[in-house]
């Protein structure tokens, strides 16, 4: 029996079935471009130029799309409501906050590998900290922390979370949260909390014009799996929101002005684009098309911290 827990700021995995010695992860730092973390059945790579996790292999299974990275994400493809309120302009700084890596450190702590990356947010004026804690099973606790510059006046943001691209074969979803349809912080009272099994293809709603779609809220755990039942499970110490689509945020984004495209015109991506958020701004328009979300459903510029665990799900042949 193996249990995984996230309590406060600590991650631990306990194997109660044996007393086999723990194989502590190790670092390889002799590559000019990548910091490599390896264990008994897994390999992770961090790009030394931007600090991002860019490779995640477990038991020979590739969990990240080639050429991609786990990246901070503050933007969504604006909805019709967002356009009505002009949020594509008002929130524009969050589309590319110009993150600049200022520090990348690594160490072994409590028999776990720890990687810490620090960033300046040039267009926002704050600082971002990403911490990755990797245990002997290849599970990764990710902590995303932002310290706002209180002296600056900065707009609200669409979301606070991260984005991950997985190979297209990871197209099966299991989750415990609100469903079965898409739901948002100010549009979820009719969505029942329960356990759901769906496909990535089912997540996209073909609005007349492409826009944000597919998010689920109040999630306790979320799994993205392939046909063999292998993949990743995401858990956090508080309910979170998530989505998985065969479309990128960029492909659904009409930019500063509506392109008058239609959803069938958007080209599908050949991978699964997963977004995991501490929170996302509500859909708004309570009393008019141009109204922004109520204050309790908005994400103001302030300090934030979000932690979640990526736990490999795989059936090891003995």
Residue ranges of model-derived segments:
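Beta-strand/loop-rich accessory regions of lumenal/periplasmic or secreted enzymes
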Residues: 16-318
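Single conserved hydrophobic/aromatic residue that forms the stacking wall/gate
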Residues: 2-8, 12-15
């Amino acid at each position: 029996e193996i249990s995984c827990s996230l309590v406060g700021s600590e991650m631990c995995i306990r194997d109660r079935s044996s007393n086999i010695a723990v194989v502590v992860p190790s670092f390889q730092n002799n590559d000019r471009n990548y910091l490599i973390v390896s264990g008994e059945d897994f390999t992770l790579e961090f790009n030394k130029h931007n600090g991002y996790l860019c490779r995640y292999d477990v038991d020979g299974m590739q969990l990240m799309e080639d050429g991609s990275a786990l990246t901070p994400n503050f933007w969504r493809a604006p909805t019709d409501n967002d356009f009505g309120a002009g949020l594509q302009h008002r929130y524009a700084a969050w589309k590319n906050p110009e993150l600049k890596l200022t520090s990348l450190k690594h160490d072994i702590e409590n028999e776990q590998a720890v990687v810490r990356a620090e960033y300046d947010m040039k267009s926002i004026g704050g600082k971002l900290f990403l911490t990755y804690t990797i245990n002997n099973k290849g599970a990764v606790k990710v902590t995303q922390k932002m310290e706002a510059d209180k002296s600056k006046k900065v707009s609200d943001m669409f979301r606070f979370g991260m984005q991950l691209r997985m190979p297209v074969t990871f197209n099966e979803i299991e989750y415990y949260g609100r469903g079965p349809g898409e739901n948002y912080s100010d549009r979820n009272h009719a969505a029942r909390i329960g356990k759901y099994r769906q496909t990535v293809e089912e997540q996209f709603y073909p609005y007349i014009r492409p826009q944000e779609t597919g998010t689920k809220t109040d999630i306790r755990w979320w799994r993205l799996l392939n046909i063999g039942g292998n993949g990743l499970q995401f858990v956090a110490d508080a309910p979170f929101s998530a989505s998985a689509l065969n479309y990128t945020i960029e492909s659904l984004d009409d930019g500063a002005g509506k392109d008058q495209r239609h959803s069938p015109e958007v080209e599908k991506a050949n991978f699964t684009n997963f977004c995991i958020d501490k929170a996302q701004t509500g859909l708004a328009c309570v009393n008019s098309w141009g109204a922004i979300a109520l204050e309790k459903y908005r994400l103001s510029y302030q300090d934030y911290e979000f932690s979640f665990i990526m736990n490999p799900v795989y059936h090891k042949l003995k």
